Amino acid sequence: MTVEEKIIDAFDRLFMEDVSDIKDEDLFDAGVLDSLGTVELIVELENLFEIKVPISEFGREDWNTVNKIVEGVKELQNA
């Protein structure tokens, strides 16, 4: 599975939301993510990809779409 596929799968498991067709849509505006969901997602991403997501790196505008989350995870994997 690619990073993108794993993240889409995580959204399905955590939030019962298929985000595969809304990869550029703001997930907060779409009602997929909220503050609690963000915490759940960070924990899942850290476990899934064996990375550490610093809270200072997880700004809403930087991680508000699936595509931005994929890029953020890839950057942290390469750090």
UniProtKB/Swiss-Prot annotation:
<protein>
    <recommendedName>
        <fullName>D-alanyl carrier protein</fullName>
    </recommendedName>
</protein>
<dbReference type="GO" id="GO:0070395">
    <property type="term" value="P:lipoteichoic acid biosynthetic process"/>
</dbReference>
<feature type="modified residue" description="O-(pantetheine 4'-phosphoryl)serine">
    <location>
        <position position="35"/>
    </location>
</feature>
<dbReference type="GO" id="GO:0071555">
    <property type="term" value="P:cell wall organization"/>
</dbReference>
<dbReference type="InterPro" id="IPR009081">
    <property type="entry name" value="PP-bd_ACP"/>
</dbReference>
<comment type="pathway">
    <text>Cell wall biogenesis; lipoteichoic acid biosynthesis.</text>
</comment>
<dbReference type="GO" id="GO:0036370">
    <property type="term" value="F:D-alanyl carrier activity"/>
</dbReference>
<dbReference type="Pfam" id="PF00550">
    <property type="entry name" value="PP-binding"/>
</dbReference>
<dbReference type="InterPro" id="IPR036736">
    <property type="entry name" value="ACP-like_sf"/>
</dbReference>
<comment type="similarity">
    <text>Belongs to the DltC family.</text>
</comment>
<keyword id="KW-0963">Cytoplasm</keyword>
<dbReference type="InterPro" id="IPR003230">
    <property type="entry name" value="DltC"/>
</dbReference>
<keyword id="KW-0961">Cell wall biogenesis/degradation</keyword>
<keyword id="KW-0597">Phosphoprotein</keyword>
<comment type="function">
    <text>Carrier protein involved in the D-alanylation of lipoteichoic acid (LTA). The loading of thioester-linked D-alanine onto DltC is catalyzed by D-alanine--D-alanyl carrier protein ligase DltA. The DltC-carried D-alanyl group is further transferred to cell membrane phosphatidylglycerol (PG) by forming an ester bond, probably catalyzed by DltD. D-alanylation of LTA plays an important role in modulating the properties of the cell wall in Gram-positive bacteria, influencing the net charge of the cell wall.</text>
</comment>
<feature type="domain" description="Carrier">
    <location>
        <begin position="1"/>
        <end position="77"/>
    </location>
</feature>
<dbReference type="GO" id="GO:0005737">
    <property type="term" value="C:cytoplasm"/>
</dbReference>
<keyword id="KW-0596">Phosphopantetheine</keyword>
